[in-house]
């Protein structure tokens, strides 16, 4: 029996986005481990805490889209290295919030420079207008995720 349905992997947007993200993450993780002894998940935690300080781990999961166990494992690793500290949430004593230490900020800044160069290399074939257009489209797609994930045939 001949199959009639098959994805065009160069035109199926979810696959293309996944392939790009997977390859970028794998390359970044390898480089960051070699250079800084942190992987991509630790970098995502560091970068989130540089953007929003004193937040619960749940907030990192929500924004970055990582599962709780991956964030928890990375936070423990970063705490043991002295990069992240936890404190009781002043608004809810049952919760803890996370923030970067001085060493965490320094590590973030070193990785940030490398991440920025990787982004520059990724986008170097695009004009500034194309980059703005790409970012606009990606942000619009990102806002559709809940709508897409709510679909049940």
What are these regions (language model features)?
Residues 1-6, 129-153:
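C-terminal regulatory/oligomerization modules of transcriptional regulators
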Residues 63, 76-139, 143:
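Charged, amphipathic alpha-helical coiled-coil/dimerization segments
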Residues 1-36, 83:
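N-terminal leader segment of winged-helix/HTH proteins
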Residues 26-70, 151-153:
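N-terminal helix-turn-helix DNA-binding core of bacterial DNA-binding proteins
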Residues 22, 27, 72-74, 135, ...:
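A structural preference for long, well-packed, hydrophobic secondary-structure segments
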Residues 12-15, 44, 121, 132:
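Active-site phosphate/pyrophosphate-handling residues
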Residues 21, 47-51, 112, 139:
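Short, locally clustered residues in the helix-turn-helix/winged-helix DNA-binding domain
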